[in-house]
Amino acid sequence: MNDIVTERSNGILRVQFNRPEKKNAMTGGMYTRLADIFNEANEDEETFVVLWHGAGDSFCAGNDLGDFLHNPPGPDAFPQGALMDAFVKFEKPIVAAVQGAVIGGGTTMLTHCDVVYAGASARFQLPFINLALVPEFGSSYSLPARIGYLRAADLYLLGEPFGATRAAELGLVTRVVPDRELLATATQTAQKLAAKPGGALRASKRLLKQGFIEQVKAAMKAEDQVFFERVRSAEAKEALSAFLEKRPPNFNKTKTPVAAE
């Protein structure tokens, strides 16, 4: 079974995460495949818009931690980087339809989408701090740019879950709709976009994002360096061990004592 399924019709490329049994959690191979899909769609003259959604009851539960632990990212093996580059270069509209679990990268990837519909069941979370990690996908810039610094800091530094209504209030999603109407609503918008003049769509998106792209690239570069350091930190090792052992993490034992004066 393919972890990502695509179908193109009438100028719309449907991209569907297809690991419903894992809530569409991402593996390294899926990052690579998704990057290839977006790069190819960017060059395809018959693709005008991407419609992105997940199979089953969730959009994406972030990284598959089993795959993450067996294939930890590093400077020489970082499939997420290829997808980041593909997002930055992508010139066509991306319409996302999200429901259920929208966790970690499942949330940060949305900051690169142009229209985002959330089903009422959507539950978002940026839990990087709980894993002793840091923001990624350029979201240390793109999220504050979209919703403001204080709101972004609240989501990142506390790492707590929030619902679809809150996501709409923050400006992270375009609109909340009933789950049963989610895909139909997103499809209708994709059809409207596909009927617009493609050259004008791409030019408009470039203008809307002028200045934004260079800032995101700089953020990605900084994030990558810090992320690789954090993955190998004592705090991250404790967080991941605690997750696998189903216990609360104890970060006190990873803290360096302050020398007495």
Predicted segments with their positions:
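Conserved CoA-thioester-binding segment of acyl-CoA-metabolizing enzymes
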Residues: 1-55, 261
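Crotonase-fold acyl-CoA enzyme core
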Residues: 4, 88-201, 229, 233, ...
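Residue-level signal for tight coil/turn positions that link beta-strands
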Residues: 9-10, 56, 91, 180
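Terminal peptide-recognition signature
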Residues: 15, 19, 34, 52, ...
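Hydrophobic alpha-helical membrane-association signature
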Residues: 30-33, 79, 109, 182, ...
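Glycine- (often His-adjacent) and acidic-residue-rich active-site loop
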Residues: 36-39, 46, 53-89, 102, ...
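Short, charged, surface-exposed hinge/linker loops at domain edges
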Residues: 205-214
